[in-house]
Amino acid sequence: MKIKLKLISFIIFNSLAFSGTTGKLVGKIMDKDTGNPLIGCNVIIEDTYMGTSSNELGEYILLNIPPGNYNVRFEMIGYKRVINDGVTIISDKTITLNGELVSSVIEGEEVIVLAEKKLIQFDVTQSEAIISSEELDGMPVTEVEEVLRLQGGVTVDSDGGIHMRGGRTSEVSYMVDGVPMSDVYSGGIGVQIENDNIQELQVISGTFNAEYGRALTGVVNMVTKDGGNKFEGSIHTYAGDYQSGDNIYNNLEKFDIQDDYSFSANLSGPIIKDKVTFYSSGRVNQSNGWLNGLQTFTIYGDTIFSDLNDNLYLDGLETQKEPYYKGLNWYDSWSSQNKITFNVLKNTIFKINTIINSRKGQDYNHFLQFLENAQITNYNEGKFFGFNLTHSLSATSFIEAKISENNFNYESYLFEDPLDRRYITPDSLFLARQENRIPEHIIEQYGDQVQYYPAYSLFRAGVDNRRFKRKTKTRNVKLDYTSQINRFNQIKIGLDFSEHSLMLDNYSILDSTLTDQVYTPIIPEKGSFTRTSYTFKPTEFAIYAQDKIEYKDMIINFGLRYESFDPKAKIPNNIHEPYIKDPRNPALDTLSLDQLENISWGDISYTEVDSNGNQINYTYANYYDRFNDQPELSTKTGWWKNTTVKSLISPRAAVAYPISDKGVIHFAYGYFFKI
């Protein structure tokens, strides 16, 4: 016999966010007829290994529950079983679910309660949005960035960068499964996460608890999906094209369904039931873009329909090739995620997670829109490897150990070989015209197309000779201890260590000499002002402690965080001389590289005789006295000096107190630190 009731369960979301990946379920179970607490009532989350029983006060606590929707079962001998259908667990929140059991003489009777989440989260102490996987499925978006744009306090700049509360793009911290995922060079997401793989997306655009570091304006915490004991899968795809009735966009009149498409699929399920599960997904995504250029000229200054056989006429195959449109902001990408969860040992869960994505494409360059094959192509690749071990010490405490490595590689170039002979400057056509090296029939036939000045018009010859390469790697270790020490206090203590590696090489191909009409590509020397090149390996360390106090209707969060940053690098002793191979002071030109590295800025550089015949000695440092910003330079030795460690102690506090069933007072204070 089943009795179906629709009730509103008392679900309360507690605490300022802990950057974790699990939530907590608490409540009290009573005898409906007598009002007495039920001791030893079983509380079971169906289709999982999680459960507990009520104590002598009828109260229960379940920690470390992954976010999602669950059926929670209350059962006890002599009472009708109660199934709470659709209980939503949210990361870093406490869900209160109380129950009343009715006596029964018929074994197997049960009551089904449909849980409904309250619209007002009375105790949230910051601006926060929680988006579940079900909500993501219903959104007309395909990228995480598109989801973020829909949240309050978030704005997007012209380059697609995410800003929270008016801050910079680099002031947002991105996390995946509780570990940092930010690219420490740009501040953006280091490895792309697909919407299909997200179980829960948490966006905080306010104050943060002590567990959060490396953030000033916002935190984005993504919890990825796990496999279960049932095989599940899905396929998502779309195809289309860009169209516009505005004539400022070229070649958008025709519709081609293959111009923009995406295909993604995922599969999850058990490898060994109740012991080992998996989740696997993949996606391919391609777009030809919406900004097209009419490919009219070759990189050498000829039209693509030029007189190839030098007979002064356009004939044969020459007339069959015409200018054509080509997408100039296209991209081609793929991604994959694979996650295995082990629940083999008692009270211990071990997870292995890998995320890989690759993308290549071009950014629109207005000045090169008429040139065939002259734009650089961008190549980027992201890889994430994560290991997560969770061990329950008791029903009210557990520890987590997380180890991760995040790699992001980005390259941008036209030709793979930097000394490729096809490199040619945009001025080459202009120089050829000035030197009368363009055939007269080309000038007569195409007129103004070859009569141009490169500084004021679209390029009709040459290539983009920029080259950019960087590699970023972050290795992270996190250890956390969480304990519900009593009814009112949940403490969390942890440490966080990251080791970074940043390599960058940025330059443009140069001409070996400007005295001839032949362009011979060369690579600028490292250390010169025309080339930025470095490799740094800084480290970050943090420890924190926080307490969440839940007393009646009041929620208090208090925490303390210490964090330090060690650049492990060298910087110039003289702020006006950043380039050791290109000194600004002419007096330094005669010194060797070894002498520059060990220079004594107080040494005599040169001697002059004034109008009175007096000899005046000038030191190297005197050259910079006019700036009046380095009074101690003459006492310094060496071109470089070591950086220092930066550290900070950050207090965090927050209070939430409901004043009615429709209102709550929030207060929060924090001191935040980010390099």
Regions found by a protein language model. Give the residues of each.
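Transmembrane beta-barrel wall of Gram-negative outer-membrane proteins
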Residues: 256-360, 380-398, 651
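Periplasm-facing N-terminal accessory domains of Gram-negative outer-membrane beta-barrel systems
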Residues: 18-114, 119
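Periplasmic N-terminal accessory/gating domains of Gram-negative outer-membrane beta-barrel systems
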Residues: 80, 85-96, 110-210, 214-219, ...
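Transmembrane beta-barrel strands of outer-membrane/channel proteins
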Residues: 115, 235-241, 280-286, 352-356, ...
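Outer-membrane beta-barrel channels and translocator barrels
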Residues: 141, 272-274, 345-347, 394-396, ...
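Signature of Gram-negative outer-membrane beta-barrel scaffolds
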Residues: 323-327, 464, 473, 484, ...
